[in-house]
């Protein structure tokens, strides 16, 4: 029983730290004017690669996104569906964790795709964005490719090299 309690404490702590990092990085993006609107560069999306290393990143990312959207005064649909897009991306990364080493970067694709598909609907229907769905999907996709794709891949290789002994 002691081992299970210790393991649960470790998972809860890691998940909470990931949620806090997500909020902090989103706030940093927001201060720079990059985290909302048609063109979004949320630095926090790079963290969506973390489920490859630890399953507790999944609730951490979801809760972090939920808190970030609440702090940004997002409308109800943005808070719900934006957070669900992050949850879908995190689950996708987790299920792609067994990819060969040279293909690990593909684990960032669920985050990119979930946001490209869901966020344009949120921007159009919740905020009344005047642009077409496909244009918004393109602009959101560019931000996701930069932050989740390149940022997440960079974070993966940095963690793999630097922290591998702690990630078992």
Model-derived regions: residue spans:
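Membrane-helix interface "capping/anchor" motifs
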Residues: 50-61, 97-105
């Amino acid at each position: 029983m002691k081992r299970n309690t210790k393991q649960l404490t470790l998972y809860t702590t890691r998940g909470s730290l990931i949620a806090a990092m997500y909020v902090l990085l989103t706030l940093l993006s927001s201060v720079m004017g990059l985290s909302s609107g048609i063109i979004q560069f949320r630095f926090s999306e790079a963290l969506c690669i973390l489920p490859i290393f630890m399953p507790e990143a999944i609730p951490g990312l979801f809760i972090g996104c939920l808190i970030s959207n609440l702090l940004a005064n997002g409308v109800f649909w943005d808070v719900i569906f934006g957070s669900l897009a992050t949850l879908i991306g995190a689950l996708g990364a987790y299920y792609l964790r067994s990819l060969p080493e040279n293909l690990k970067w593909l684990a960032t694709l669920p985050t990119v795709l979930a946001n490209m598909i869901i966020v344009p609907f949120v921007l159009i229907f919740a905020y009344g964005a005047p642009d077409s769905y496909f244009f918004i999907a393109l602009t959101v996709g560019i931000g996701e490719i930069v932050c989740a794709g390149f940022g997440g891949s960079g974070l993966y290789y940095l963690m793999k090299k630097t922290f591998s002994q702690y990630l078992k």
